[in-house]
Amino acid sequence: MSWSAVGIDHLRMDFILIAREPGVSKSEACREFNISRKTGYKWLARYAAGGVAALVDASRRPVSSPLRVSGDVVVELVRLRGKHEYRGPKKLRAMLLRRGFSPDAVPSLATIGRILRRSGLSETKGRGRPPKQLPTGPLSSAEGPNDVWTVDFKGWWLTRDGRRCEPLTIRDLHSRFLLCLRPVVRRRTDEVRAVFEEVFGRYGLPGVIRSDNGSPFASLTGPCGLTRLSAWWRTLGIKLERIDPGHPEQNGGHERMHGDLAREVQRQPAATVAEEELRLERWRVEFNLERPHEALGMKVPGEVYHPSSQKLGDARPYVYPLDFERRRVAKDGCILLQGQTVYLSEALGRQEVGLERLSEACRRVWFCDLAVGEIVRDGDGYTRRPAAPACQPPPTDCNPCPDNKV
C-alpha cells in the first residue's frame, strides 16, 4: 500500500518497525509498502532524528510570503468587483493603481482572477463561438479624437411606471469617450437633431459620423442613403459612413458599450424616465472618467478625449462650381426646372443642390459632393434616375466647405 492510504502516520510507523527488525531488508520493506527506496530512507532518517513526532507531515507553507496580497488590497478588490460586477482583472487592477496602491502591492492579473474565484465573484466561461468574419468595407480609422463618431440607439426598455426609455448614444471612436447618452421620446428627426446641436455646441464637429442604416440616420431607399438628419450633417462638412446592413460587428465597440449599459442599468430600470435619465448621465460620467480601457493603455476615455477645433458656428454653406445651376429644394422634396416640378427627395428638403449639365437632355444633381441623381428630359417633361456609379465630385476652387479638420 502507498502513503496515499488513510492513516498515513500509522503506516509510516508500521514501516519503521518492520524496516528496523533484524534481518529485514530495507528494499523489501519499501516494496511491501509500495514506496520508493528514497522515500523509505527519508522516513527512517527522520525517525532516527526526531522519533514518532517526526513522522507527521510538516507544514508546506513558506516561512515568509513576500508576494502575499495585503488584506487592504483584497478588501478593496472585492469592494470594486461588487460595485462593478462586469469588470475583469485588467480593469480592476488599473482601478486599484488609480486609487493609490503601489504597483508592488497590487497583485498580478492571474492572482486577481484567483481572488475573485475564491470569493465567488467570478465564473468560468465556456469556449465561445468563433468570431464572425470581419467586413472589408472602406470604414475609416480613427487616428485621434473626433476623427470618427459612432451613433446608434440603445434598444428600448420600460421603466417601472411602464414608460418607454430608448437612449440615443454618441461615442468618439478613438478615445471611447461617450459624448451623449440621452433618452428620446421617439426617433423623430427634429428631436434627434436638437440633441446633436447640443452635442456639437459642446464638443465641436467630427470628421466622420458612422451609423447603421436605420432611421433617422440613413435610408436604404433614399438617394445616397440620405435622410434629413444626415443631409444636415453633410452641410456641416461631416462625412457620412454607414455599416453594412445586418452587420453590427462593424460598430463593435459601440455594441459592447451597449452591452455594458444593458447589464448595469437596463437590468434594474428606474421608476420613471426622468429618474432613468439621471442614472444614465451618472453612468456616462463614470464610463468617461472612471472606467479604464485596455486599448487606451488602461487610461480612462476622459484622459484621451479633447473637443474638436472645428466648431458648429464655423461651418459655411457649400459653394458649387460657377457653371452649375443652383436650386433650392422645397420642403416636399421638389425643385423647379424650366417651369416644371421635378421630385428629388424629401431628405433634401430646404437644402440647396447643384445641377451639372451633361447634355441638352440630362443634368446631374449634386448635393454638396454627393451625386444624388440625374434629371433626364422625357418628352415634354423630366424624369429622375439614379446617378451613374462612382461619380466624382466636380473640381472647384471656391468651395469653403472642406472636410472637417479636428
Task: Mark where each language-model region is.
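Short, Lys/Arg-enriched anionic-surface-contact patches
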Residues: M1-D14, V63-G71
